[in-house]
Amino acid sequence: MFQLLCAVFIGGGTGSVLRWWLGMKLNPVHHAIPIGTLTANLVGAFVIGAGLAWFNRLTDIDPMWKLLITTGFCGGLTTFSTFSAEVVFLLQQGRVSWALLNVMVNLLGSFAMTAVAFWLFSQAASR
């Protein structure tokens, strides 16, 4: 049990640090859309899709790796709370169109990245 806890802890810490770094580097790039948060959410969606596809096919992998990557890393990297706060901030500034675009791109982009990665890695794992 302690090993599993450590796997989630290490993955979560790594994902959180990467999310912070992406925000620091990429959020200033655009005046209205927080590109760092979007990147973190899209990358996390892709990684979890790929991970789930691999873990579905390769059942002999230690469950610790699934926890480290999906629950830990992706859980630390992706962020619904920051995304929500950024949308509220845009709404408070009267930037309704930007807020709606941000919601649409984050949600649809995350769904698409998860589906594409799952499909790609399912195909690769079946070969």
From Swiss-Prot:
Catalysis: reaction(s): fluoride(in) = fluoride(out)
BP GO annotations: cellular detoxification of fluoride
Membrane topology: Multi-pass membrane protein
Protein name, UniProt field: Fluoride-specific ion channel FluC
Protein family: Belongs to the fluoride channel Fluc/FEX (TC 1.A.43) family.
Keywords (A to Z) from UniProt: Cell inner membrane, Cell membrane, Ion channel, Ion transport, Membrane, Metal-binding, Sodium, Transmembrane, Transmembrane helix, Transport
Transmembrane segments: 4-24, 35-55, 71-91, 101-121
Activity control mechanisms: Na(+) is not transported, but it plays an essential structural role and its presence is essential for fluoride channel function.
Annotated residues for binding of Na(+): G75, T78
Domain of life: Bacteria
Its job: Fluoride-specific ion channel. Important for reducing fluoride concentration in the cell, thus reducing its toxicity.
Compartments, as annotated in UniProt: Cell inner membrane
GO CC list: plasma membrane
GO MF term list: fluoride channel activity; metal ion binding
Biological source species: Klebsiella pneumoniae (strain 342)
Entry-linked InterPro entries: FluC (IPR003691)
